[in-house]
Amino acid sequence: MWSCEDLNYTNSGEEQYLCNEFHLFLFIFSVLYLIICFPVGLCYNVQLVLVNLYNKATMTMPDVYFVNMAIAGLIINAVAPVYLFGPAYTKWSLWSFGNEVYITLLILFNVSSLVIMYSTTLLSLDYYIECALPRTYMSSVYNTKHVCGFIWGGAVLTSFSSLLFYICNHVSTKIIECSKMQNREAADAIMVLIGYVVPIIAVIYALVLILQIRKEATPLDQESGRLDPSVHRLLIATVCTQFILWTPYYVTLLVNTFMDARVKSSNTFYIRIFQFTEGLSNFLAFSSSFVLPLIHRHINKNFSGKLQRLLKRLHCGSQGCTHEHTVVQQVMT
């Protein structure tokens, strides 16, 4: 976040007034996020992870992808308050952390954003495979460890080159090798490519193939044992939500890469417009951490039953409920 004290307004009082309005608008959104979105996202993401881990026997591949997205959402949920109320915004000495802490938070945010995008992409591609060959892949979780390792490991590896530019941009005075890698715009361009362009191309390709298959009237499409239709609604809602919330963030990165409005523009009005847009896009990106579990909770019809089993287990303890013992005794009798 930013404050209106960063730049001097010498032209008129309108720019100062507009800056204060932008600042107040983002401040209200930040407070609302901290009061509403943060606890809701924390609760529902933890709930999504625990419910699926407890019901491992009934997990499907969509559940695996949503668990990974929920874990990434928890990380983003933890980073968001530090960003929204950080030292650049509040000027509090309590938040005066160094470059190392900033880089750590940036790494966590970038990796988590890639995990969310890659999980959404793989969900789309796997759903296409399931539509083409029903009951062959998504109903099984035999390769869960490999999928999770691929998602998180791939996110770390693909973001490594971008992270080098970010690190060298902040600690170049300490590392001689970083003297030629002080280009934040290059890091932003890499993140746009690997975190948005590649996933959206893959998702669009998968959705086109899925649409073609659903238009064809084949016996496989009429099969009663095919994948739950609610998975299709969940897929469409997830893809649309993720790209709606993350597109502004990557667009601002792209604009900053090719224009660098904060440096090249001498007009403080346009600088503040860009900073306001950038702050709003970051807020939308943070919002994905609580919107996604809400969508999953309301569309996935099997989640409520899994949650009830988990709550019953927690309520009864490891020895089981009284009515369960009664049923067992009746069967034995």
Swiss-Prot record:
GO terms for molecular function: G protein-coupled receptor activity. It comes from Xenopus laevis (African clawed frog). Disulfide bonds: none annotated. It is found in: Cell membrane. InterPro entries: GPCR_Rhodpsn, GPCR_Rhodpsn_7TM, GPER1-like, GPR146. The gene is gpr146. Keywords: Cell membrane, G-protein coupled receptor, Glycoprotein, Membrane, Receptor, Transducer, Transmembrane, Transmembrane helix. This is G-protein coupled receptor 146. G-protein coupled receptor required for the regulation of plasma cholesterol levels. Pfam families: 7tm_1.
